[in-house]
Amino acid sequence: MSIRDWPAAERPRERLLEQGSASLSDAELLAIFLRTGVPGKSAVDLARHLLNQFGSLRLLLEADQEAFSKQLGLGPAKFAQLQAAQEMSKRHLAERSRQKTALENPQVVRDYLKVMLRHEPHEVFGCLFLDSKHQVLTFEALFRGSIDNTAVHPREVVKRSLANNAAAVILCHNHPSGNSDPSQADRLLTKRLQKALELIDVRVLDHFIVGDGEPLSMAECGWM
């Protein structure tokens, strides 16, 4: 049965407009993005099929163009639309983070870091550079690959802190495994960067680790 033949209260688009996007399932949200189904499948049926094929919404969003485009009902045009939507979301949250005080609204920072880092297939280490009022100046991804105590160079973090005229920084990196628990290398790296930045009077406020759930704050856990 076509979605057009469903009762209005059950159609994903109408439900989104009436109840908000948070009320929809992953399949319903994806169905709105797809807009149409394929012969024998409604957009919701197709969305469920795709989520089953990829394993989760996150894995679908992280898929490269080749893996994405070869699936039923998808293609280069849909891939381009999805990439554009994700980039708009990143830029929206980047602008929000620059307009709000990080320490007074840590959830804005968490939300921003989830969008920026959660879908990266490899580890990425970055910094949120803050001014003296702890307003976000900018975000920079500084290192990519295996993040350990030797891969991240304190001198580069110091250099970028000076270039951005930062008074404080929030460190962050992702764990592609999804487990946000800090490793011993993560803790050692944090200490090294704290010591290096102390020499130029830049304070490290926190180190967030982004996994599948809410980003973990090392400061809140008492590890800084």
From Swiss-Prot:
Give any single GO term for biological process: proteolysis
- Where do the annotations place Zn(2+) binding? H173, H175, D186
Q: Which residues form the MPN domain?
A: 102-224
InterPro entries assigned: MPN, RadC_JAB, RuvA_2-like, UPF0758, UPF0758_CS, UPF0758_N
Motif JAMM motif — list its residue ranges.
Answer: 173-186
**One GO MF term attached to the UniProt entry:** metal ion binding
**What name does the UniProt record give this protein?**
UPF0758 protein Pfl01_5539
Q: Does the keyword Protease apply?
A: yes
Alphabetized PROSITE patterns for the sequence: MPN, UPF0758
Record-stated family: Belongs to the UPF0758 family.
One Pfam family from the record: UPF0758_N
What keywords sit in the KW lines?
Hydrolase, Metal-binding, Metalloprotease, Protease, Zinc
